[in-house]
């Protein structure tokens, strides 16, 4: 077995036997890693509560010959305690973990996705912004090469913003008045999505809750679910309408 060091965010855990857990992490250099934490469920475990979902950790482990590695040592970088203790922040945080769990490839490094996840969790800990998760979804879609087309009608090429009035997941972007189908998109919603993908993230995260933010949240969530070809279990009931 090969010894490795890395940093990672715990995405999820499942029980293994009487005392162990299988921990899934998004790491900086090794992509998604599934590893056994031996004895983690014992009262006097050397890991304590450091391997719970959301924990950002530095780890030392052994890379196994099969699908599972073995965690040897763990040091906490951040527990994102503010997020854990606030249900309004925990829900979007868990949806972001779920997205990364679905997109990341095992043992295939994706430092940018790791950095985006850590950055999004830090932003959520800093402020209870309703735009953190939808912005994360849109940015991840862009990273995947699947960002929605927002500047021109994906059917006919119309580029007059005032005529772009609908969003169609099948087509992968906005549609004009002549081609419209799918769900309506408001000028404000279209502008906010463009700002999100255009680099004005600080201003986007400063947006207060509003009908436009709700609209973008629904659109971004639907776009991500279409990309994954599955519903996100962690998305609150009623969040997508």
Go through the PLM ranges and name each one.
Residues 1-241:
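Non-catalytic alpha-helical scaffolds and adjoining flexible linkers that form interface surfaces
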């Amino acid at each position: 077995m090969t010894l490795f060091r890395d940093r990672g965010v715990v995405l999820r855990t499942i029980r293994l036997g009487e005392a162990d857990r299988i921990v899934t992490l998004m790491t900086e250099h090794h992509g998604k890693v599934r590893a056994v934490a031996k004895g983690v469920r014992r009262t006097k475990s050397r890991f304590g509560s450091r391997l719970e979902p959301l924990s950002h950790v530095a780890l030392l482990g052994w890379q196994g010959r099969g699908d599972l590695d073995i965690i040897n040592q763990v040091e906490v970088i951040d527990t994102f305690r503010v997020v854990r203790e606030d249900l309004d922040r925990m829900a979007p945080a868990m949806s972001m973990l779920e997205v990364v769990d679905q997109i990341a490839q095992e043992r295939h490094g994706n430092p940018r996705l790791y950095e985006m996840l850590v950055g999004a969790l830090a932003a959520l800990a800093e402020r209870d912004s309703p735009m953190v998760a939808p912005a994360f979804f849109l940015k991840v879609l862009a990273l995947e090469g699947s960002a929605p087309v927002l500047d021109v009608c994906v059917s006919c090429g119309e580029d007059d913003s005032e005529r772009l009035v609908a969003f169609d997941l099948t087509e992968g972007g906005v549609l004009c008045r002549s081609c419209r189908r799918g769900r309506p998109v408001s000028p404000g919603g279209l502008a906010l999505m463009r700002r999100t993908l255009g680099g004005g993230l600080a201003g986007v995260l400063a947006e207060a809750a509003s009908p436009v933010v709700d609209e973008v949240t629904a659109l971004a969530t639907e776009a991500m679910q279409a990309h994954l070809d599955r519903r996100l279990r962690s998305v609150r009931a009623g969040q997508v309408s």
